[in-house]
Amino acid sequence: MKSDIRVCANWETTHDRPVYALGDRCPECDGPTENSAPAPFSPEDPYGEYRRRVRRRASE
């Protein structure tokens, strides 16, 4: 998933809290930013099988 909101890549070492931005550079430390959205798939997802089953049934 791609998000327009980005977070400072170095926030854990540079800032005391996450710093969010819309651009490619952090507004406070001028460091790079990265996508803040979580990964859309996790192998440990306990309910993923059920969601996929519902989607398959809905598309049939």
Swiss-Prot record:
Any one Pfam family here would be Nop10p
As for what it does, the entry says:
Involved in ribosome biogenesis; more specifically in 18S rRNA pseudouridylation and in cleavage of pre-rRNA.
Q: Which organism is it from?
A: Halorubrum lacusprofundi (strain ATCC 49239 / DSM 5036 / JCM 8891 / ACAM 34)
Q: Name one GO cellular component term.
A: ribonucleoprotein complex
Please list the GO biological process terms of this entry. Answer: pseudouridine synthesis; rRNA processing
* Region feature (Disordered): 29-60
This protein's name: Ribosome biogenesis protein Nop10
Q: Keywords on this record?
A: Ribonucleoprotein, Ribosome biogenesis, rRNA processing
GO molecular function terms here? snoRNA binding
- Record's family? Belongs to the NOP10 family.
